[in-house]
C-alpha cells in the first residue's frame, strides 16, 4: 500500500536520516513532501534518485492528502504544527519531547509496545537514550520484575544535531564551541539540557526517568539517572544498574535477552561498532553483588538511527501494516 508521506525537518540530521532509512527499508511511498523552515525553502533534496524541493513549513502549505508525517523539527514546531496536520487526518510521528508525557499520546518503541499505536493521530518517539535501553529492560521487567534502575549515560555529540558534530570538529582544530557551553573535545560535560530547579536533575535525566515509567506502565518505578555528553560522534551508551524483584540465573537471563526483539547480545559493544545499525546492543551483563538480585548491563545504540529516525520509520511501517489489514 502506497501512502503519502511528509518529513517535517527534512534538512536536519534526523530528518535526513529518516529519508535514508525509508529508502533502505523500501517503504512504498505515493507522494513525498519535505518540509523545513523558510531559510531552506526551494533547496533540493535527493531521494531514491529523484529531486524534491523543500517546502516552507507554514499554515498555507499544510496538505490534506498526507497520510503520515514524520516530525523532527523541535518541540516548538511540533507544538504548533503537529495538531494542524493531525486535524487533516494525518498520523503524526513526533520525534520531539513535546507530546511524550501527554497521557493521550502513546510513547512507542515498536519492539516493545506497538499495540499502543491503534487509531492515535499523534504518536511520540521516545528520547534517544530511552529507546536505547527499553528493549532490554522490557524483557527483564516482564521476566523478573524491576525494583530500581540507575542510569549513567554517555551521549554522543550528534545528539545535539549538526551543531554538536561541528563543535567537536572545531574543538579538534583549536576553535571554541558554539553549541556546547564548554569544550567537548578531550572532555566530558556532566549535564545535558537545562537544569530543573526543584530536583537538581537535568531535563534529559527527567526524560529518561519519566519515559521509562510510561513505556513500561510502571508510574512508581524507582529510577535515577545521570546524563553526560562525551566526545564521540555517533551512538549513545548507557550503564544500567538494576535491582530485580526475583532471583535469576545469569545465563538464562542472557539467553532471554539474546532472543528479545531488537536486542543483540555482545560481549563488549562500543559506539563506533554500532554506528549505522538499527538494533540495541547489550553487553557486560553481570551480577551486582552489592545488592540482592542486582544486575549490571552496558547498552549501546546509534542515537540518530534507532534512537530517532529508525524508530520513527518502524512506527510508520506499523501504521501502514494496520491500514493494509484494516483496509
What residues fall within each predicted segment?
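Glycine-rich phosphate/pyrophosphate-binding beta-alpha loops
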Residues: 229-231, 301-306
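A glycine-rich, Thr/Ser-enriched phosphate-binding loop motif common to dinucleotide/cofactor-binding enzymes
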Residues: 123-132, 200-209, 304-311
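Short hydrophobic/aromatic beta-strand micro-patches
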Residues: 241-243
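Oxyanion-binding "anion nests"
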Residues: 187-232
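Conserved glycine-rich beta-strand-loop-beta hairpin in the small C-terminal domain of fold type I
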Residues: 233-238
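N-terminal Rossmann-like NAD(P) cofactor-binding subdomain of oxidoreductases
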Residues: 1-184, 222, 246, 274-276, ...
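Short amphipathic alpha-helices in soluble, non-transmembrane regions
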Residues: 250-260
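A glycine-rich dinucleotide-binding beta-alpha-beta segment and adjacent secondary-structure elements
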Residues: 258, 263-284
Amino acid at each position: 500500500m502506497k501512502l503519502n508521506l511528509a518529513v517535517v525537518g527534512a534538512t536536519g540530521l534526523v530528518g535526513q536520516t529518516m529519508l535514508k532509512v525509508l529508502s533502505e527499508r523500501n517503504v512504498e511511498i505515493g507522494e513525498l513532501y519535505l518540509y523545513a523552515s523558510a531559510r531552506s525553502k526551494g533547496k533540493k533534496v535527493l531521494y531514491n534518485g529523484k529531486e524534491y524541493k523543500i517546502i516552507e513549513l507554514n499554515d498555507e502549505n499544510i496538505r490534506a492528502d498526507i497520510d503520515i508525517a514524520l516530525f523532527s523539527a523541535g518541540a516548538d514546531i511540533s507544538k504548533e504544527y503537529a495538531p494542524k496536520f493531525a486535524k487533516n487526518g494525518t498520523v503524526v510521528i513526533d520525534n520531539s519531547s513535546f507530546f511524550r508525557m501527554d497521557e493521550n499520546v502513546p510513547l512507542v518503541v515498536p519492539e516493545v509496545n506497538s499495540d499502543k499505536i491503534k487509531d492515535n493521530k499523534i504518536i511520540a518517539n521516545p528520547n534517544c537514550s530511552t529507546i536505547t535501553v527499553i528493549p532490554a529492560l522490557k524483557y527483564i521487567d516482564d521476566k523478573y520484575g524491576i525494583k530500581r534502575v540507575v542510569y549513567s549515560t554517555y551521549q554522543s555529540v550528534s545528539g545535539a544535531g549538526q551543531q554538536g558534530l561541528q563543535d567537536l570538529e572545531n574543538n579538534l582544530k583549536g576553535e571554541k564551541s558554539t553549541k556546547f557551553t564548554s569544550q567537548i573535545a578531550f572532555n566530558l560535560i556532566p549535564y545535558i539540557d537545562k537544569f530543573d530547579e526543584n530536583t537538581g536533575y537535568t531535563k534529559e535525566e527527567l526524560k529518561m526517568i519519566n519515559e521509562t515509567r510510561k513505556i513500561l506502565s510502571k508510574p512508581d518505578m524507582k529510577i535515577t539517572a545521570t546524563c553526560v555528553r562525551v566526545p564521540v560522534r555517533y551512538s549513545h551508551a548507557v550503564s544500567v544498574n538494576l535491582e530485580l524483584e526475583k532471583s535469576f540465573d545469569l545465563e538464562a537471563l542472557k539467553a532471554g535477552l539474546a532472543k528479545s526483539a531488537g536486542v543483540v547480545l555482545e560481549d563488549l559493544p562500543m559506539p563506533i561498532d554500532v554506528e549505522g545499525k538499527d538494533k540495541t546492543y547489550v553487553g557486560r551483563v553481570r551480577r551486582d553483588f552489592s545488592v540482592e538480585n542486582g544486575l549490571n548491563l552496558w547498552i549501546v545504540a546509534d542515537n540518530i538511527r534507532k534512537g530517532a529516525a529508525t524508530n520513527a520509520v518502524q512506527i510508520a511501517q506499523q501504521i501502514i501494516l494496520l491500514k493494509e489489514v484494516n483496509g
